[in-house]
């Protein structure tokens, strides 16, 4: 086993114990998980190289410190073990299991189950669907917006969520975004033959929004919306940003959202979600001229 392979195995163990890679990033003081996703990709790419340096000492010390591991833990081989589901549940926030399965070979359809002490979610999507949706989340206005993604993206979306709505809608909105992002990433597979980029302008009366997507494997959200009020019905508009952060970080897409005008908050939100659906439809579509090629001079969009 190379040094890099050893570091990778131990790094993945830390992520599993934390509940997920984004939660490990938060534990270690990162604002977003992008740096740790890039570290994972580099370790995977260099795993078989005996001369690769693995994780640099300063980052190794940071990971060990924030996860309560002794100094040098990442440099040592440990007996493989699985985090018990009951132990994960006892933390109150840990992600207990993520199950992702394609329904058939070559079919861009997937079901993801994500269960925590805050939410229990099942998301099924078909990127080559007809725009149907079946939504049971307990948050009516969020369902109305996700229905726009399905209808305008021509993506079939089925979401069932039982969340801690007695507290508020925050965990439900964020975790649905996370799980939907995981489903998009899994359904896309190696991304060969897709257009990769998508964009859309959508108006609704006085409101106009622009959404641009790059399915690059590089998560990043630029979010420019100044809603004219803080609540639409009883839904807190701040949660839209949490929803899109979840999608971005777990689908590994770059997403720019700009509401260019609008006075009615409902119209502002609806133009954003319709534009997102249409931009996503464009980005995930197969380009017949690509003939199964990866739309990148790098040769991959998953490493």
Curated annotation (Swiss-Prot):
For this protein, what is the EC number? 4.2.1.19
Q: Which UniProt keywords apply?
A: Amino-acid biosynthesis, Cytoplasm, Histidine biosynthesis, Lyase
> Is the Lyase keyword given for this protein?
yes
EC top class, as a word: lyase
**Localization in the cell:** Cytoplasm
A cellular component term from Gene Ontology for this protein is: cytoplasm
Keyword S-adenosyl-L-methionine listed? The answer is no
Reaction(s) this enzyme catalyzes, per UniProt: D-erythro-1-(imidazol-4-yl)glycerol 3-phosphate = 3-(imidazol-4-yl)-2-oxopropyl phosphate + H2O
Q: Which GO terms describe its molecular function?
A: imidazoleglycerol-phosphate dehydratase activity
Give the pathway annotation.
Amino-acid biosynthesis; L-histidine biosynthesis; L-histidine from 5-phospho-alpha-D-ribose 1-diphosphate: step 6/9
Give the protein family. Answer: Belongs to the imidazoleglycerol-phosphate dehydratase family.
Name the record gives this protein: Imidazoleglycerol-phosphate dehydratase
């Amino acid at each position: 086993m190379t040094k890099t392979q050893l570091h990778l195995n131990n790094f993945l163990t830390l992520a599993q114990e934390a509940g997920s890679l984004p939660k490990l990033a938060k534990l270690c003081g990162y604002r977003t998980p992008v740096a740790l996703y890039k570290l994972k990709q580099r370790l995977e790419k260099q795993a078989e190289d005996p001369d690769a340096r693995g994780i640099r000492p300063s980052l190794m010390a940071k990971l060990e410190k924030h996860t309560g591991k002794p100094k040098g833990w990442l440099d040592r081989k440990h007996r493989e073990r699985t985090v018990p589901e009951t132990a994960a549940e006892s933390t109150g926030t840990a992600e207990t299991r993520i199950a992702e399965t394609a329904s058939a070979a070559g079919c861009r359809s997937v079901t993801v189950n994500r269960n925590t002490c805050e939410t229990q979610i099942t998301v099924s999507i078909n990127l080559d669907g007809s725009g149907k949706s079946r939504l049971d989340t307990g948050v009516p206005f969020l369902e109305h917006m996700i229905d726009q993604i399905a209808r305008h993206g021509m993506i079939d979306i089925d979401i069932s969520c039982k969340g801690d709505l007695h507290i508020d809608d925050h965990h439900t909105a964020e975790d649905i975004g996370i799980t939907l992002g995981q489903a998009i990433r899994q359904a896309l597979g190696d991304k060969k033959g897709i257009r990769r980029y998508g964009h859309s302008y959508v108006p609704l009366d006085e409101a106009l929004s622009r959404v641009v997507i790059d399915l690059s494997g590089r998560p990043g959200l630029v979010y420019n919306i100044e809603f004219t009020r803080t609540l639409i019905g009883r839904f807190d508009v701040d949660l839209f940003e949490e929803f899109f952060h979840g999608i971005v970080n777990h689908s590994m897409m770059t997403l720019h959202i700009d509401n260019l005008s609008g006075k009615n908050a409902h119209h502002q939100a609806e133009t954003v979600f319709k534009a997102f659906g249409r931009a996503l439809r464009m980005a995930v579509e197969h380009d017949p001229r690509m003939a199964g090629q990866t739309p990148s001079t790098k040769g991959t969009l998953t490493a």
